[in-house]
Amino acid sequence: MPGITREEVAHLARLARLELKGEELDHFAGQLDDIIGAVARVSEVADQDVPPTSHPLPLTNVMRADEVRPSLTPAQALSGAPAQEQQRFKVPQILGED
């Protein structure tokens, strides 16, 4: 597998709007080669008999089921409110809307 060239790193840097100096181009070229090599090794391991997954554990929606339970009446909920209007909490206006 041919390595990443300085020109390719410079092109990627331009696309990312990064300004890299000459020694940085060499440094990042080596790092990108290492990353591409690691991805290639993972690709070799990921065989046809290993299904692609988005999560390592087979968990789906581990939340409890909804159930109706007794709760406060509107009057009880509003009993401690400093201000209320039409069975709702009344709060100071924070936006400039009427």
From Swiss-Prot:
Record keywords, A-Z: ATP-binding, Ligase, Nucleotide-binding, Protein biosynthesis
Disulphide linkage map: none
Pfam family, one: GatC
UniProt GO molecular function: asparaginyl-tRNA synthase (glutamine-hydrolyzing) activity; ATP binding; glutaminyl-tRNA synthase (glutamine-hydrolyzing) activity
Region span, Disordered: 75-98
GO biological-process terms attached to the record: glutaminyl-tRNAGln biosynthesis via transamidation; regulation of translational fidelity; translation
InterPro entries (alphabetical): Asp/Glu-ADT_sf_sub_c (IPR036113), GatC (IPR003837)
Top-level lineage group: Bacteria
ATP-binding as UniProt keyword: yes
The keyword Amino-acid biosynthesis is annotated on this UniProt entry: no
Gene3D superfamilies in alphabetical order: Glu-tRNAGln amidotransferase C subunit, N-terminal domain (1.10.20.60)
Catalytic activity, as annotated: L-glutamyl-tRNA(Gln) + L-glutamine + ATP + H2O = L-glutaminyl-tRNA(Gln) + L-glutamate + ADP + phosphate + H(+); L-aspartyl-tRNA(Asn) + L-glutamine + ATP + H2O = L-asparaginyl-tRNA(Asn) + L-glutamate + ADP + phosphate + 2 H(+)
The EC number(s) this enzyme carries: 6.3.5.-
Function: Allows the formation of correctly charged Asn-tRNA(Asn) or Gln-tRNA(Gln) through the transamidation of misacylated Asp-tRNA(Asn) or Glu-tRNA(Gln) in organisms which lack either or both of asparaginyl-tRNA or glutaminyl-tRNA synthetases. The reaction takes place in the presence of glutamine and ATP through an activated phospho-Asp-tRNA(Asn) or phospho-Glu-tRNA(Gln).
Family that this chain belongs to: Belongs to the GatC family.
The protein's assembly and partners: Heterotrimer of A, B and C subunits.
NCBIfam families recorded: gatC (TIGR00135)
This protein's name: Aspartyl/glutamyl-tRNA(Asn/Gln) amidotransferase subunit C
Species this chain originates from: Streptomyces griseus subsp. griseus (strain JCM 4626 / CBS 651.72 / NBRC 13350 / KCC S-0626 / ISP 5235)
Lineage, opening ranks: Bacteria, Bacillati, Actinomycetota, Actinomycetes, Kitasatosporales
